[in-house]
């Protein structure tokens, strides 16, 4: 490898269950830690979700994401617990991504105790990410994204707080942001949201209006 090249290898759990990834330093040219479960019609047919995954005490840097789910999640991703992440010089701190045609689900994800020092985006949850393996996929097969909690996040030198962009006919639901504080060296870009419902508590900068106050939702707490 040339001394100026960035290693592309990272750590991916794909169609895996009962996995623990911990106590690691990673520097890569890809998402540092990612969870996947198959790609479009092939992942739907294989039908093996990633579940029961614990990730903790990870430090690292990447031009992409620190922790990611997707975008290939056609077999489903559920019951994921992530804590104590320390990322610097990132593209995106936390990136949850899927697309029309994927199908599957992303649910019961909890991410907490995250420190970011330098990122284009603190957080992205998006339903329009990733290509398709061929033309045989069904664009009407939509993923379900439900019950994603992100809490106790502190970031500095962040260019834009975050983007949460669901799918018109499959709104991302029960998205909870709690004690999420993101600051920029200058004026930080605001949250941008659409096709999402959920709650927000003690979030800086102020969250988008699509995330109702916790008194209206009841599921999003500190």
Residue spans of the language-model regions?
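Extracellular/periplasmic carbohydrate-active domains that bind, remodel
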Residues: 1-222
């Amino acid at each position: 490898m040339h001394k100026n090249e960035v290693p592309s290898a990272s750590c991916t759990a794909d169609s895996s269950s009962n996995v623990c990834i911990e106590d690691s330093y990673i520097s890569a040219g890809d998402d540092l830690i990612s969870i996947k479960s198959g790609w479009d019609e092939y992942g739907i047919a294989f039908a093996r979700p990633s579940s029961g995954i614990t990730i903790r005490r990870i430090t690292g840097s990447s031009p992409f994401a620190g922790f990611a789910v997707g975008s290939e999640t056609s077999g489903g991703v559920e019951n994921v617990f992530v804590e104590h992440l320390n990322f610097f010089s990132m593209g995106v701190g936390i990136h949850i991504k899927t697309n029309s045609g994927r199908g599957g689900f992303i649910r019961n994800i909890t991410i907490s105790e995250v420190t970011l020092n330098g990122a284009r985006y603190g957080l992205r949850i998006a339903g329009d990410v990733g290509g398709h393996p061929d033309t045989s996929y069904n664009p009407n097969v939509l993923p379900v994204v439900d019950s994603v909690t992100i809490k106790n996040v502190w970031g500095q030198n962040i260019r834009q707080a975050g983007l949460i962009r669901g799918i018109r006919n499959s709104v991302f639901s029960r998205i909870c942001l709690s004690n999420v504080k993101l600051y920029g060296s200058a004026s930080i870009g605001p949250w941008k949201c659409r096709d999402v419902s959920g709650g927000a508590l003690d979030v800086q900068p102020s969250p988008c209006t699509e995330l109702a106050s916790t008194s209206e939702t009841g599921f999003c707490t500190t």
